[in-house]
Amino acid sequence: MARVKRGVTSHAKHKKTLEAAKGFYGRRKNTIRAAKAAVDRSMQYATRDRRAKKRVFRALWIQRLNAAVRECGLTYSRFIDGLAKAGVAVDRKVLSDLAITQPEAFKAIVDKAKSALPA
């Protein structure tokens, strides 16, 4: 049986690593050892930040809603409470988008939430 030396396999792995390191600065773009470390770390960052992105966007929607709702004389927490009591099931992403693109429709939703709150 012939001996298998794995040269083709390691070359393919190295090529794949260097492709992933394309655009990196300095040695990390063309030295296998440095590129592998940089690519591994970049994958860790990517995994972490895919999860963080969801939190960041939710916080952004809440900030936008708070600003838009305060113009109508409510706070964010009272607005969300009013929506729950009125039975309006629209998520924060859609509400934030409405506040920016269709202020009159958003105002109608705010009025509905206000009417559901006790005076």
UniProtKB/Swiss-Prot annotation:
Entries under CDD domains matching the protein: Ribosomal_L20
Keyword Ribonucleoprotein: yes
UniProt keyword list: Ribonucleoprotein, Ribosomal protein, RNA-binding, rRNA-binding
Gene3D superfamilies: 6.10.160.10, Ribosomal protein L20
Residue pairs linked by disulfide bridges in the UniProt entry: none
Coiled-coil features, chain-numbered ranges: none
Single GO molecular function: rRNA binding
Domain of life: Bacteria
A cellular component term, taken from the record's GO annotations: ribosome
GO biological process: ribosomal large subunit assembly; translation
Matches recorded under PROSITE patterns: RIBOSOMAL_L20
InterPro entries: Ribosomal_bL20, RIBOSOMAL_L20_CS, Ribosomal_protein_bL20_C
HAMAP family listed in its UniProt record: Ribosomal_bL20
Function: Binds directly to 23S ribosomal RNA and is necessary for the in vitro assembly process of the 50S ribosomal subunit. It is not involved in the protein synthesizing functions of that subunit.
Protein name, entry field: Large ribosomal subunit protein bL20
Lineage: Bacteria, Pseudomonadati, Pseudomonadota, Alphaproteobacteria, Hyphomicrobiales
